[in-house]
UniProtKB/Swiss-Prot annotation:
Name used for this protein in its record: Phosphoribosylaminoimidazole-succinocarboxamide synthase
Source species of the chain: Mannheimia succiniciproducens (strain KCTC 0769BP / MBEL55E)
A GO molecular-function annotation: phosphoribosylaminoimidazolesuccinocarboxamide synthase activity
Enzymatic reactions: 5-amino-1-(5-phospho-D-ribosyl)imidazole-4-carboxylate + L-aspartate + ATP = (2S)-2-[5-amino-1-(5-phospho-beta-D-ribosyl)imidazole-4-carboxamido]succinate + ADP + phosphate + 2 H(+)
Annotated GO biological process: 'de novo' IMP biosynthetic process
Length: 286
């Protein structure tokens, strides 16, 4: 990643944040990939650029539902030209918001940790679901299944809606739930017209200086969502997805114990992953 003259204030699994002033920061998406909450050694070339383009597309498309973190500035407004040229496709100028300490997950279909919970209890995050659902079943309605936000390296934990209310307050919990479901419904309906099923996704929200709920971070990318192709979707199977699933599947069968460091991922698996990210961008935005 290019070194920037701005002061780095945070380095996450994928994104780095730089201070511009007390109201704004620069968010840069790297090519880092995390799987099972471990950051892998090998980057995925151009991944940060593709993710930024997908996110920007959705932020604009969903702006009528709620405010987002954009300030209206470009990277050229806040960086010297030679630095801006290096990061222009993977960086955005965003508001400094007070993040809400909950992962806002919406599920439209049953898979992953949700399916595990359902098999054991018939519920997800305490929500009762109909009997007889299987892998990849479409849920009667999209559901909001929050998880607690853990520090980088810790696994996030699914929590009930009541626990979400306890952590962030009743009023805010309802606002977050309703916003997340509205965003998911609109995005899922659009994606379906492009041949993509959005199985589930994670939104991040923050509060601005006036306390207004604001959409932030990344939106509906293959990193924060499971995208399935309409063509390969079959209920009862685990459909292939447009994301790091290639890498996750390879790691699963490599015998790795999911503790850092992760094993080196083969070049062909990395290339297939890049191709999947690019395909998602092309399908959604063309």
């Amino acid at each position: 990643m290019a070194e920037l003259s701005l002061k780095k204030i945070y380095s996450g699994k994928v994104r780095d944040l730089y201070e511009i002033d007390d109201k704004r920061m620069l968010m840069v998406a790297s090519d880092r990939l995390s799987a099972f909450d471990v950051i892998l050694e090998d980057p995925i070339p151009r991944k940060g650029e593709i993710l930024t383009q997908i996110s920007n597309f959705w932020f604009k498309k969903l702006a009528h539902i709620m405010p987002n973190h954009f300030t209206g500035d470009t990277v050229y407004d806040v960086l010297p030209k030679e630095e801006a040229d290096l990061v222009k496709n993977r960086a955005v100028v965003v508001k400094r918001l007070k993040p809400i300490k909950i992962e806002s997950i919406v599920r439209g279909y049953l898979t992953g940790s949700g399916l595990k919970d359902y098999k054991q209890t018939g519920t997800i995050c305490g929500l009762q679901l109909p009997q007889g659902l299987v892998e990849a079943s479409k849920l009667p309605e999209p559901i909001f299944t929050p998880s607690s936000k853990e520090e980088v390296g810790d696994h996030d934990i699914n929590i009930s809606y009541a626990e979400c209310e306890r952590q962030i307050g009743k009023e805010l919990a309802a606002q977050v739930r309703d916003a997340a479901i509205a965003l998911y419904k609109e995005a899922a309906a659009y994606a379906l017209t492009k041949g993509i099923i959005i199985c589930d996704t994670k939104f991040e929200f923050g509060l601005d200086e006036n306390g207004t709920l604001t959409l932030m971070d990344e939106v509906l990318t293959p990193d924060s969502s499971r995208f399935w192709s309409v063509d390969t979707y079959r209920e009862g199977t685990n459909p292939p997805s447009f994301d790091k699933q290639f890498v996750r599947d390879w790691l699963e069968q490599s015998g790795w114990n999911k503790q850092p460091p992760a094993p080196k991922v083969p070049a062909d698996v990395i290339q297939k992953t890049v191709d999947k990210y690019q395909e998602a961008l092309d399908l959604l935005t063309k």
